[in-house]
């Protein structure tokens, strides 16, 4: 029998089979061809793993960084929250408790104590006296044990309300017209043309009072917020028929209304004639808030109330309402009250205004407390350089070396208080002209324009700012300069070196217009032309321009008074002018009162 091995050998012997050595070579070649591809795949996988690890590391770093920043902000917020909690707990909570105690417990107790105090004082001081309270609810429901003067107060209150209602409808259009700019706009590139006209007063109480044997000595006019007021001294020889005395003082008030198209009409609504009173020779005037106020005196120099009754000078106070209510019109003599350092005040033709129920005027005053500063100002300015004023030996209006200060007169028009004139003084630029100091309402709430007119053609006048409040301050504005030689707050008016101009016989007062921008007007009586003329000068300091217009006169003479008061109407300049002169031909005195209008236009406007 064959063994199993022999059978296998016999099988392979008789059958073909692959050579084992040749098969091994083929397998090695296949493995050699696969090795590079396998390595490439492994390399790619390795690179991918590295990239994934890198990205994972970067993201992990960003997350860690963000967590750190968030933790930092969270810690800061916790600190701030802790601080706020501390403030609320340790500061605000006790404060609220204190406020609650004050408001809830102590304040009602204090108010009750004050109420009891007022009631006790009211009952103690003349409980039967008639009180004149200024609020309407006192008329309707007066308190117990207090007697209210219904007849006086309620009539005044009702009349004022009715007057204000009627006047506002009339004056609204006037006030709108009175703020317009009179000059061409800034875009004007051509020549500015001016045209003037003269108009007689359509209706004038003064002209109706002046008869042939009568003469107006002086006239003072004030215009404010559509209201005008006038006062003048009328001298007449016709004492038997019309008046008891040769001299009478006339006051009139009214509003400016439209008449004949575009012409303003001075419509008189109330007037008063005072005769047989020597204290009305010199008067001031102020208008505003539907009223006229005036201070009248016999002499220009007034000695305020200094305690000596023999040296006191009383001032006649005249008040007129717009529509002539008897209880609003007042006539009373008052003694001015001033600080003991104020020695004298000088009252002439002064124009003021009424604001917040207070009439205010500016006058020269002689104050002992201000003399030192003014003398030092002038002395220091005259040490090294000779100004024209350094040669003066006497100063207006008090004479000698006594330099005047700026005085302010205030008169309260509140009917709940007695009439009183308070005098206060302030230091300002040196005053060369002691006549005609005026006060105009300014665009600022706490100040007005204080003007002093020019004089003799060499002093240009000056315009200052003067405060309205309790503290009286005068600040230089224009037409003044500060000398280099002076180290203190020293200002002098501009004074020319030239000799007095003989062609200018008289200068008027300085008028500040009620426009939004600062503009002012002055007039002169000029004889340089073949015909005499009143020449108007209109200034606009903001634009550094000025305009001149002469109004030729039909007569020739020597003037002694020239007074103007200007306002804006429909964008044009209107002025009420009054002048008195002595005719050369007949040597008689003549007075003229009329209106002038100056219109400014531009030849070419830029688009």
UniProtKB/Swiss-Prot annotation:
This is Hemagglutinin glycoprotein. One of its GO terms (molecular function) is host cell surface receptor binding. Pfam families: HN (PF00423). GO terms for biological process: symbiont entry into host cell; virion attachment to host cell. Belongs to the paramyxoviruses hemagglutinin-neuraminidase family. Non-sialidase subfamily. It is found in: Virion membrane; Host membrane. It is a single-pass type II membrane protein. Glycans are attached at residues 149, 276, 391, 422, 456, 587. InterPro entries: Hemagglutn/HN, Sialidase_sf. Its main location: virion. One of its GO terms (cellular component) is virion membrane.
